[in-house]
Amino acid sequence: MNAVTGLVFNIQRFSTDDGPGIRTTVFLQGCPLRCKACSNPEGLIARPQLMYRASKCIGAGQCGFCLPKCPEGALSVGADGRVVVDFAKCTGCGACADVCPSRAMEIVGRRMTVDEVLAVVEADEAFYARSGGGITLSGGEVLRQGRFARALLQEARRRGLGTAIETSGMGRWPVLESLLPFLDVIHYDIKCLDRERHRRFTGLPNDLILRNFRKLCAVFPHDRIIVRTPFIPGVNGTVEDVRAIGEFLRGIGDDLHYELLPYHRYGESKYGFLGLTPPMTAVVPTAEEAAVHAELTRYRARERATVPLSPAQGAPLVERLRRPTAR
């Protein structure tokens, strides 16, 4: 029995974008970055949090079970009869969610053991065997829960499951290094090379991320590293931005894989459920960014695979972005 515990805010089955084959993605809670385009804001803080979907609330007149349960007095009744949450008072205790029949109130983030997580993961073991899939740890940031991540990966490997992580690289190198013996694939985010722009977008500079990436490439097989850049208007959306990252990677090795991810706003509604304001609702892409994004989206629709950086194998989109623009 493996009793090591960690904070998990979601377990997503049948994932096809988080590594080879069909996978189960385990999302670990807690992240040092505050990316303005984060699609999982419920994974930023390392503690259980309340997500409240007011549209699902039955209303205090027909229900109201939650109102007397809150020990902090964070719940009241709005003008439309639905419950209103004062998130400044909420501690995420879960008393309201326990009695909510419509699941308008939900606690995200709970402490789980390695065995509890793998019990969910192994339910789809037959699909992993046929597709070459397995378990992927994501977040949040995996490196924030290094001991739990290592225990999960080690036990998954012992049970014959394929293993992968998705990381920003924002963590201590010894933590990342400790995971390597138990990993088949690493997805590594490099959002932006410009230090100050990275700080403005994520809250922190990228020195540690790039330093850890260089160390990783020195000790881990390049063909098992997939570098990802989520396309973000105002951050890395121009041809020059993407080309700079491509050239940086080629300076390390042509056998790395590079994946450009189209811009999306999937996580925007979650901010409201957490009582937060989405930080990027007003972002409007420039004409150049819109053109690059349109080409990227068309390319991704045709080719789902990752893109080798080798000129001999390079994909049309990436090669086009590498070429100097006409003046």
Question: For the regions a protein language model found, what residue spans apply to each?
Answer:
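General zinc-binding finger modules coordinated by cysteine/histidine
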Residues: 59-61, 65-68, 116
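Extended, non-globular alpha-helical segments
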Residues: 52-58, 109-124
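Iron-sulfur cluster-binding cysteine motifs and their immediate structural context
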Residues: 36-43, 64-85, 95-111
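N-terminal pre-triad scaffold of radical SAM enzymes
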Residues: 8-62, 83-92
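Short glycine-enriched, charge-decorated loop/helix-capping segments at active-site entrances
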Residues: 52-55, 199-205, 274-283
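Conserved AdoMet/S-adenosylmethionine-binding subsite of the radical SAM
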Residues: 115-266, 270-272
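Auxiliary Fe-S-binding modules of radical SAM enzymes
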Residues: 1-20, 222, 233-327
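Hydrophobic packing within well-folded, soluble alpha/beta domains
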Residues: 35, 90-96, 100, 156, ...
